[in-house]
């Protein structure tokens, strides 16, 4: 089969709405990750919140953004993906604009009449509600617009585009922040989502009516959630795994603070954090091949160990790099701390790529027979739990050890300790449950 035949085969394997939905998802991810890498700095450095307040605000936004899709998916099924996309992008466009407007001088007189903390709580909740409809709508579209023989490839395209957005979004944010100011990153994210709102109205068509059977309404979703959270063994696993994601989210809380305070407020934090996504794009396939014979339990433990070692690496090495500058290829006179942090994030990413593909297999093994799909549908709860607490934890740690005690390396030691605890708990969990199904 030649290249043209391959392209035609791919095109014919998907309904046009598949491509529209995935392109819109790409632009949504560009908007999301562009602003997410800077949210903590925007709240603290630009809006002058404390680290604790910044962590709390980040927790509200991130926690809801990962929790609400459980319920948003049922509503998207009920009202249709076109309406869900339209609602999501309209709300995101308004929400990102409002977040950015809180830091623009033109609107300062208006916001001076209110407590900005609670204003942002409302805005962030509003924005998270809109964002929660994206993932179920895109995944639902992929499911309904792919042929049986192309469905797996369709999901691969979706996940690849998500990582492309996570890699390129921060780079665009860096360019905007450097040329216009940090507040305008949110305006650009707003414009991106507004364009996708128009794209939905113009290009997106509801998928063909081979609608999934037995769609769940909100009552059924709540019943399923109750079934899951009353499974003690599964909930313990989710709580342990949430510790892993708490470590990950500190790249968006602790690391931006540290880079701004101890390296340079003008350092390209967006580029630093995007290393995780670039590593996934470049190394996910070879790592999958190298680790395909490792058991699910061991793959997850490897992920935990890499995540733990990442913070130990920073604890030992990063403080000694202060005041040392070097040249890296075309990057001249750069603080040595920057490549050290990038190396730590890369280490974390290797572990993430090892455990992530096996995570759903592990959950299938944990689930009672006949309920594998149900339990996998709630597999992202650890991310929601981790964001819900991780932002607040990270903000508090930084305030106590860096702002008050001027001893930031202790933050890395505490995070290392959390990693050790998570790894030990997972080892104990696997031992206790090794003969259970």
List each model region and its residues.
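Juxtamembrane intracellular "pre-TM" segments in multi-pass secondary transporters
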Residues: 2-15, 210-239
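Extracytoplasmic gate region of multi-pass secondary transporters
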Residues: 32-40, 232-270
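Loop-to-transmembrane helix entry
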Residues: 49-63, 118, 153-156, 260-279, ...
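Central cavity-lining transmembrane alpha-helices of secondary-active solute carriers
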Residues: 59-74, 274-287, 385
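Glycine-rich segments within core transmembrane alpha-helices of 12-TM secondary carriers
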Residues: 65, 152-177, 192-193, 379-392
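Helix-to-loop junctions at the C-terminal end of transmembrane segments
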Residues: 68-81, 177, 282-302, 398
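C-terminal ends and interior cores of transmembrane alpha-helices
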Residues: 90-115, 306-333
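A membrane-interface helix-boundary motif in multi-pass transporters
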Residues: 114-117, 175-192, 396-420
């Amino acid at each position: 089969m030649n290249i043209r035949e391959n392209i035609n085969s791919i095109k014919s394997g998907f309904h046009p709405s598949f491509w529209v939905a995935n392109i819109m998802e790409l632009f949504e991810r560009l908007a999301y990750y562009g602003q997410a890498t800077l949210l903590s700095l925007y709240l603290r450095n630009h809006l002058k919140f404390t680290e604790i307040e910044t962590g709390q605000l980040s927790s509200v936004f991130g926690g809801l953004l990962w929790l609400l899709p459980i319920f948003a998916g049922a509503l998207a099924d009920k009202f249709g993906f076109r309406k869900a996309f339209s609602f999501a992008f309209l709300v995101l466009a308004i929400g990102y604009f409002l977040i950015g407007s809180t830091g623009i001088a033109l609107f300062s007189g208006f916001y001076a009449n209110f407590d900005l903390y609670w204003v942002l709580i409302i805005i962030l909740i509003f924005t998270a509600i809109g964002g929660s409809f994206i993932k179920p709508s895109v995944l639902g579209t992929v499911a309904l617009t792919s042929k049986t023989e192309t469905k797996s490839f369709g999901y691969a395209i979706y996940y690849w585009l998500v990582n492309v957005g996570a890699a390129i979004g921060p780079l665009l944010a860096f360019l905007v922040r450097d040329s216009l100011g940090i507040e305008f990153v949110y305006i650009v994210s707003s414009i991106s989502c507004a364009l996708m709102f128009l794209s939905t109205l113009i290009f997106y068509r509801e998928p063909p009516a081979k609608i999934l059977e037995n769609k769940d309404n909100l009552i059924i979703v709540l019943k399923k959630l109750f079934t899951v959270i009353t499974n003690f063994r599964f909930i313990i696993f989710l709580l342990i795994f949430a510790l892993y994601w708490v470590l990950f989210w500190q790249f968006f809380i602790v690391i931006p603070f540290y880079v701004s305070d101890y390296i340079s407020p003008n350092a390209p934090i967006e580029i630093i954090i995007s290393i995780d996504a670039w590593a996934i794009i470049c190394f996910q396939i070879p790592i999958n091949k190298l680790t395909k014979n490792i058991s699910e339990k061991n793959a997850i433990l490897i992920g935990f160990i890499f995540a733990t070692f990442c913070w130990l690496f920073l604890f030992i090495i990063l403080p000694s790099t202060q005041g040392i500058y070097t040249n890296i290829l075309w990057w001249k006179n750069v603080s040595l701390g920057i490549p050290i942090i990038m190396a730590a994030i890369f280490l974390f990413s290797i572990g993430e790529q090892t455990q992530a593909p096996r995570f759903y297999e592990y959950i299938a093994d944990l689930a009672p027979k006949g309920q594998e799909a149900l339990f996998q549908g709630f597999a992202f709860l650890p991310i929601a739990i981790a964001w819900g607490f991780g932002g607040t934890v990270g903000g508090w740690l930084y305030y106590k050890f860096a702002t008050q005690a001027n001893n930031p390396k202790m933050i890395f030691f505490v995070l290392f300790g959390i990693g050790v605890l998570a790894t030990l708990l997972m080892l104990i969990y696997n031992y206790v449950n090794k003969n259970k199904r």
